[in-house]
Curated annotation (Swiss-Prot):
Belongs to the three-finger toxin family. Short-chain subfamily. Type I alpha-neurotoxin sub-subfamily. GO terms for cellular component: extracellular region. Disulfide bonds join 24-44, 38-61, 63-74, 75-80. Expressed by the venom gland. The lineage of its organism: Eukaryota, Metazoa, Chordata, Craniata, Vertebrata. Binds to muscle nicotinic acetylcholine receptor (nAChR) and inhibit acetylcholine from binding to the receptor, thereby impairing neuromuscular transmission. Produces peripheral paralysis by blocking neuromuscular transmission at the postsynaptic site. Has a lower toxicity than cobrotoxin. This is Cobrotoxin-b. Coiled coil: none annotated.
């Protein structure tokens, strides 16, 4: 019985990947590329829009709501928002 419980515990830990944290790019379009560890988040985002300065790109953790005219791409793997 103890062996069965231990086996189930190991399988659960391996399958759930406990402690995993997502890593996302988090720079603005004009900044040097950087990444951030996103505790508690399951998404990275990249949003972009155009104005008098040209195309503006913003990256970060989460998946925010955006205003009309702002493009948004949300994704779920490490550094997927490049």
């Amino acid at each position: 019985m103890k062996t069965l419980l231990l086996t189930l515990l190991v399988v659960t830990i391996v399958c759930l990947d406990l402690g995993y944290t997502l890593e996302c790019h988090n720079q603005q379009s004009s900044q040097t590329p950087t990444t951030k560890t996103c505790s508690g988040e399951t998404n990275c985002y990249k949003k972009w829009w155009s104005d008098h300065r040209g195309t503006i790109i913003e990256r970060g953790c989460g998946c925010p709501k955006v205003k009309p005219g702002v493009n948004l791409n949300c994704c779920t793997t490490d550094r997927c928002n490049n």
